[in-house]
Amino acid sequence: MSLPHLSLADARNLHLAAQGLLNKPRRRASLEDIPATISRMSLLQIDTINIVARSPYLVLFSRLGNYPAQWLDESLARGELMEYWAHEACFMPRSDFRLIRHRMLAPEKMGWKYKDAWMQEHEAEIAQLIQHIHDKGPVRSADFEHPRKGASGWWEWKPHKRHLEGLFTAGKVMVIERRNFQRVYDLTHRVMPDWDDERDLVSQTEAEIIMLDNSARSLGIFREQWLADYYRLKRPALAAWREARAEQQQIIAVHVEKLGNLWLHDDLLPLLERALAGKLTATHSAVLSPFDPVVWDRKRAEQLFDFSYRLECYTPAPKRQYGYFVLPLLHRGQLVGRMDAKMHRQTGILEVISLWLQEGIKPTTTLQKGLRQAITDFANWQQATRVTLGCCPQGLFTDCRTGWEIDPVA
């Protein structure tokens, strides 16, 4: 039996459909959409850079449109979500606690995220900290005074911050909420009172099978080699997983133009029929975060979208090719470009410092309309009243070369 043959555009559209980025939202977002959208992606990576809206809020905005950013914080505080190390530090459904509990119980395998020597050296102080949380309730690292005021850099964290990070990685405490994006910790047994390790623990092998299932569903269409990166799995049993899921017809083989044979998750079978009939169309234009699942695996983004991306915020300014915090631009199924932007919150201006189009992308009327609306929506969501434009490709935004005002109801 011959494999279904898909164009590269169809493969991209199927992936974007799995990620919730194929079409513009048809309705106003609701509070319930926050955990639902994170479940769809499986993971929502956390990053603290706030040159524009912080990444987790932006990833949700790209899919949901205009929504109150505090909804993510509320979803965490209500216990619908949890934080832990997955792809990197991530929000995930709290029901997935079982998938990462084995990591908590072996923190010494977590590399730089857990320093056993530090935890042993400060054992008595850490025991006092645990007792303090037990007696006084949840804490932030900011609740404790730094003994070396003026120190800076992650390697000079105040001791209680390092203690809490270690306890977090070891699963002794969990994040129950964020206040001004600062973590608030409580003891794990109070956050998960019904959990019992002896009764409920899932083995690493079993957990990784479910992680591979989640990765396949969230990617929608994939090469086998793309799966492990989603949860940062080191040596998953990929061959056995693939054979089992193919036999169960939970994944099916397809042939994709330029990419060869890929796998398709069975959740996308209805869309596969539309793609084969030439009826699967991408209509969404959006500003993406550098930590969006669509681009967080740089090799996958290059293979699937022909989009080479590198985060340059840690690169010295003179050596940057594009800018400090460059945002990929999605338009109708393609990653058509990127922009270096900064939100000036005091003046209400979204500054587009520079914008670049991918090689071969023409500044058509449709492209200009889509990108202008995407940038306008992005600015409006951040309460901007104006967009200013710096360097742009020739022929793009010729009728508003220096920028435009924001209509609050746009």
Swiss-Prot record:
One of its GO terms (biological process) is interstrand cross-link repair. The keyword Signal does not apply. Pfam families: AlkZ-like (PF06224). Changing Q45A: Abrogates d7mG excision. It comes from the Bacteria. Its EC number is 3.2.2.-. Disruption phenotype: Deletion of the gene slightly increases cellular sensitivity to the cross-linking agent mechlorethamine. It does not affect sensitivity to the methylating agent methylmethanesulfonate (MMS). Keywords: DNA damage, DNA repair, DNA-binding, Hydrolase. GO terms for molecular function: DNA N-glycosylase activity. DNA glycosylase involved in the repair of interstrand DNA cross-links (ICLs), which are highly toxic DNA lesions that covalently tether the opposing strands of DNA, thereby inhibiting essential cellular processes such as DNA replication and transcription. Acts by unhooking both sides of the ICLs, forming abasic (AP) sites on both strands. Unhooks ICLs derived from various cross-linking agents, including azinomycin B (AZB) and mechlorethamine, also known as nitrogen mustard (NM), protecting cells from the toxicity of these cross-linking agents. Belongs to the DNA glycosylase AlkZ-like family. This is Interstrand DNA cross-link repair glycosylase. It comes from Escherichia coli (strain K12).
